[in-house]
Amino acid sequence: MCIRDSDKVGLYDTVRAVMCNQAPASNISGCWQSLEGIQHNMLNFLENHDEQRIASYFFAGDPRPGIPGMIVSAMMNTNPVMIYSGQELGEPGMDDEGFSGRDGRTTIFDYWSLASLRNWINEGAFDGGKLTAEQRQLREVYAKILNISKSERVITEGVFYDLMYANLSNPYFNSHRQFVFMRKYQNEVLLVVVNFDKAEQTVRIQIPDEAFKALDFGDNKAAVQTDLMTGENCISTLTAAWPYQVVIPAYSGRLLKFTY
């Protein structure tokens, strides 16, 4: 795959603003719309050597808002995604580094050592033995997101369908703090809904007739529903007749795969 560019002025800037509650989540729709035809060649990211760390005081001040942002960045299309060294550990980038100073970034101009990575390395054991419980939990979530993104063909090869247009006026869905879309591959449909809010939310997602036609799957047809984050299975269905209710934890997302 030829990567032409990173999606900095677009998805990164937009998702960052949403994570900081400075823009509505619905703005994310404009990112893929502006890249029609070249999105598969763009590199998605939330941290890199130029940008401030999510957990820094200059950004979100907390690594958890990065989880819904990472789900969107990793699963919205088939293009590559990157995590930066220590992002999965909530590295804050708040050291007072030599040339760079205390700017919320990890210096590329100085010889420097990050406490979060040292704690994961654990004096050569590489077992995360010195990580905090919060760091271990965050790393597990990132590992799930990345492994799902690379192993599920509905993500690596599936088509994308944005559901935000059908939920902008939905009184049971906050388009400022939640974002929802679908992916489809063969007999699999993936419903992805994320919550950028600090509190758990119960939403009711409208899935229009157009979605069933565009993705070519049956309205109100029984399917095996798998929660990809937990592995739990049940029999469920999607329909345009009534909204689909989902409970989303704070700063998180639900990845519900329907196999027909």
Where are these regions (language model features)?
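Short, small-residue-biased leader/transition segments that mark boundaries at the very start
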Residues: 1-3
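Acidic, His- and aromatic-enriched active-site or binding-groove loops in soluble protein domains
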Residues: 5-10, 107-110
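Residues at the C-termini of beta-strands that transition into short coil/loop
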Residues: 9, 46, 112, 226-232
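Core domains of carbohydrate- and sulfate-ester-processing enzymes
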Residues: 13-34
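Loop/helix patches that line or flank the sugar-binding groove of alpha-linked glycan CAZymes
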Residues: 26-27, 36-48, 53-222
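Short, P/G- and charge-enriched loop/turn segments at secondary-structure junctions
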Residues: 30-32, 167-168, 242-244
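Solvent-exposed beta-strand/loop surfaces of large extracellular or lumenal domains
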Residues: 221-241
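C-terminal beta-strand-rich structural cap/linker in extracellular carbohydrate-active enzymes
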Residues: 235-260
